[in-house]
């Protein structure tokens, strides 16, 4: 395996993934801007809607987001009246969408879908492979970050 970069090429997986994530995030953020949502806020609404009711820790795990960052995002959505929280077991909070939040999610979903469809179409038949590679990169990175897991 070569670690030599050609002129203008960046070989670092971490750098390339961060650059791609920022560019992709900006693309989706522009699509969601008319709804005063960003990509993470939309992902939160979409995942809660899919689950119906969802514990905060399950959402944090699914989106691979630290609790403090999630709580900040949830506070904004709750303040705007899009989500509500109920007490769960212990200190756990159970999240659900309000009617206003569900209505916003449905309106924003159309803009998200246009962007998603364009992205998928641009990859063409390579989309399933690309998606599989993203899942692998995430799983590998998480395993390598967890000293109890090691490299699989």
Question: Which stretches of residues belong to each language-model region?
Answer:
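Short, locally clustered residues in the helix-turn-helix/winged-helix DNA-binding domain
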Residues: 18-21, 46-50, 109
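Short alpha-helical elements of helix-turn-helix
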Residues: 11-15, 35-46, 71
């Amino acid at each position: 395996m070569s670690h030599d970069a050609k002129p203008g090429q960046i070989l670092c997986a971490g750098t390339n993934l961060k650059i791609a994530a920022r560019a992709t995030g900006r693309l989706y953020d522009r699509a969601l801007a008319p709804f005063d949502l960003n990509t993470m806020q939309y992902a939160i609404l979409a995942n809660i809607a899919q689950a119906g009711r969802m514990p905060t820790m399950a959402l944090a795990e699914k989106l691979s987001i630290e609790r403090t960052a999630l709580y900040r995002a949830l506070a904004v959505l709750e303040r705007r009246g899009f989500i509500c929280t109920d007490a769960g077991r212990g200190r756990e909070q159970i999240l659900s969408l309000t009617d206003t939040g569900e209505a916003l999610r449905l309106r924003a979903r159309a803009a998200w879908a246009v962007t998603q469809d364009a992205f998928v179409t641009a990859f063409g038949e390579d989309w399933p492979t690309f998606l599989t590679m993203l899942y692998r990169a995430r799983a590998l990175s998480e395993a390598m970050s967890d000293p109890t897991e090691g490299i699989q």
